[in-house]
Regions:
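Eukaryotic scaffold repeat domains enriched in small/polar residues
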Residues: 1-179
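Register position in tetratricopeptide repeats
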Residues: 154-155, 188-189, 222
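Boundary/linker segments of alpha-helical solenoid repeat arrays
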Residues: 174-178, 203-218
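TPR/TPR-like (Sel1-like) alpha-helical repeat modules
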Residues: 187-209, 235-236
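Juxtamembrane/start-of-transmembrane alpha-helix segments at the extracytoplasmic/lumenal side
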Residues: 212-231
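Selected alpha-helical membrane-embedding segments in polytopic membrane proteins
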Residues: 258-362
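Hydrophobic alpha-helical transmembrane segments and adjacent short intramembrane/lumenal linkers
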Residues: 331-335, 344-450, 454
Length: 472
């Protein structure tokens, strides 16, 4: 009471640590535990500081009741709903089996599963929590083969482990554990490209990055003289042109080419975006007085931005690519992109019209298009660099994207300020009101859509009922 008020004490959330549902101590004295009510670190292998030595990257049940660890370090865990999960000594999920059934007495099914144990022959013993009968499971040839491969790898017998994992793959070609095992064996054998193939199938980006680092080093050492020679040749060519091209024929030809590009109105309007990042205030002033830019050029830039955004989402290197285009709803993305853009433009135009802004609807439409070039360049750079960087160099991509996004936001802010002839305070206020208006319009639109769907279902049901009555 000396520190907190009564209201603070009432609202204070009790910091109660999660409790273990069970403990196990193996032959080496290492303590293992299971925790209920969490999907992270539900199975723990404790070090002397109490931390978890396992790296469980797979989804774990939040109702683990018991566990057992055999002499090889393999972890067997029971789930209250009747499932049995088996993990490797390092925490990789090997397999899961079992199910829940309250009204059936079927082998392998449980009403609840409170405990588990394993004998010296590798047989799993369980007890049904409600019905009270024991069930035992004998390891299959496939399971024994997996256990054997893991044991060989832990003993450092990588060639023998590779042979064993290869046999496992013959039985199950999509086994993530087997592909990881083959990849690790290849990694220790120095067969990095083959290791990358298996890590890619297994979705193991950490080890893929490790193998890729070795492949990249080998490529750099082999190609560095060639790359250096090409760069030196280009520098020498540039030097010779500057020295012997006294009449500047090459430079004039380049200028003529650029001039021809700028004589094409649409191309000129698109390339106008390149001037914005360097001098945003001056160039947005030119846009304001209708000297530069066009709705057509802005539309092309929006299209290019959308294409780059989709490539950024789906086209990065394996290490940094977490989405597949098959898992994306393209129609929803296209509609969402168009809706957000349209709402921002309309809301900002309406707000600035009330707040005495000078910008027209077309100019408000053009401002974001000409301001997002740094973000577009950043996305293009990240896409390319994602194929040559490893996990440890991810911070470079983060910095590049952050620079591009911040630069683009500054451009758009200055564009709104310049085109509407606002002060900084007025621009901030107009943006706040724009986003509030944006949210209100979005909520109203969603309500209308939901009500229309309900009305349509109601009318459809009436039509169906009327048709049924007429026919009968």
């Amino acid at each position: 009471n000396a520190i907190f008020t009564r209201a603070q004490l009432e609202n204070l959330v009790a910091r109660v640590p999660t409790t273990f549902s069970n403990l196990f101590i193996d032959d080496k004295g290492i303590v293992y535990s299971t925790t209920m009510g969490t999907h992270t670190d539900a199975v723990k292998k404790h070090n002397t500081a109490g931390g978890n030595m396992l790296k469980l990257q797979t989804y774990q049940s939040d109702s683990l009741t018991d566990l057992y660890v055999d002499s090889e370090g393999i972890i067997y865990a029971s789930v209250h709903e009747g499932y049995i999960e088996v993990f490797s000594a390092s925490g990789e999920l090997i397999f899961e089996f079992g199910s829940n059934a309250f009204d059936m007495d079927v082998s392998g099914l449980y009403s609840s599963l409170p405990t588990i144990a394993v004998d010296h022959n590798g047989n799993i013993w369980t007890a049904d929590g409600d019905k009270g009968y024991l069930q035992s499971f004998q390891p299959t040839d496939y399971a024994l083969m997996v256990y054997g491969a893991m044991e060989l790898y832990e003993q450092g017998r990588y060639e023998e482990a590779l042979e064993q994992w290869t046999e496992v793959l013959k039985l199950n070609q999509m086994s993530v554990l087997a592909h990881n095992g083959v990849g690790k064996a290849y990694l220790h054998a120095g067969r990095y490209e083959e290791a990358m193939e298996h890590f890619k199938v297994a979705g193991n980006r950490e080890y893929y990055s490790e193998a890729f680092w070795e492949v990249r080093n080998t490529w750099i050492q082999a190609k560095l003289p060639v790359v250096t020679g090409i760069l030196a040749s280009l520098w020498l060519l540039s030097f010779l042109i500057k020295k012997f091209d006294k009449k500047r024929i090459v430079r004039k030809a380049k200028k003529r080419f650029i001039h021809k590009l700028f004589t094409v109105p649409v191309v000129k309007d698109v390339l106008f975006a390149c001037k914005i990042p360097r001098h945003p205030i001056d160039q947005y002033y030119n846009l304001r007085v209708s000297r530069s830019g066009s709705v057509a050029g802005a539309s092309i830039l929006y299209l290019l931005f959308f294409i780059l955004f989709m490539a950024y989402q789906t086209g990065k290197g394996f290490i940094y690519q977490f989405k597949d285009i098959e898992d994306m709803d393209i129609n929803a993305i296209v509609i969402g992109f168009a809706a957000i853009l349209a709402l921002f433009v309309i809301c900002n135009y309406l707000v600035t019209s009330i707040k005495d802004g000078d910008g027209s609807l077309g100019q408000v439409y053009m401002i974001p298009a000409y301001g997002v070039l740094p973000a577009m360049v950043s996305m293009a750079i990240v896409i390319v660099m994602s194929y040559v960087l490893t996990y440890n160099e991810a911070f470079l991509l983060t910095i590049i994207m952050a620079i591009g996004i911040v630069w683009s936001i500054i451009n758009i802010f200055l564009g709104l300020q310049t085109v509407h002839d606002y002060t900084m305070k007025e621009t901030l206020l107009s943006l706040v009101i724009t986003f509030v208006f944006f949210i209100i319009v979005t909520i109203i639109t969603l309500i209308i859509i939901i009500m229309w769907e309900q009305l349509w279902q109601f009318l459809k049901s009436i039509g169906t009922e009327a048709t049924r009555n007429v026919l009968h």
